[in-house]
């Protein structure tokens, strides 16, 4: 019997060792899974933070470019009154030689002024036949015998824009 008892104890010891090995393996697997999960969570957080940082960089660059493009907007808007005055001076009829020379000088000044405005992105809004509320300001409506409804009849004051932003709409009369 003692031989059987010995065999039984040996089997028990082997089973016990085998169970301990399995338990140890299970513990290692659980720890490895936990570490992998922690790693995946941290990697996901890193990727999200990095993507958010890149989006912030792009947004800041876009805002910087926009600020640069429109930095002179209010200054340019104020200069449009000077431009209007120069254009009005050009439209005055001259009858003597001195007035013609002055008008020529004003025209040269106006041309230079327009070139400088264009250099900084201020451009004339092109005249369009159809009324566009994004570009035009309707001052009044007229009966348009020769014009279709909604068509621009007369430009009363030129409009200007910087890049794609209107700084002064074109003031027009519109056919009913």
UniProtKB/Swiss-Prot annotation:
Its main location: cytoplasm. One of its GO terms (molecular function) is protein-folding chaperone binding. Gene3D superfamilies: 3.90.20.20, Head domain of nucleotide exchange factor GrpE (2.30.22.10). One of its GO terms (cellular component) is cytosol. Disulfide bonds: none annotated. Pfam families: GrpE. GO terms for biological process: protein folding. Residues 1-31 are annotated as: Disordered. Keywords: Chaperone, Cytoplasm, Stress response. It is found in: Cytoplasm. Participates actively in the response to hyperosmotic and heat shock by preventing the aggregation of stress-denatured proteins, in association with DnaK and GrpE. It is the nucleotide exchange factor for DnaK and may function as a thermosensor. Unfolded proteins bind initially to DnaJ; upon interaction with the DnaJ-bound protein, DnaK hydrolyzes its bound ATP, resulting in the formation of a stable complex. GrpE releases ADP from DnaK; ATP binding to DnaK triggers the release of the substrate protein, thus completing the reaction cycle. Homodimer. Belongs to the GrpE family. This is Protein GrpE. It comes from Campylobacter jejuni subsp. doylei (strain ATCC BAA-1458 / RM4099 / 269.97).
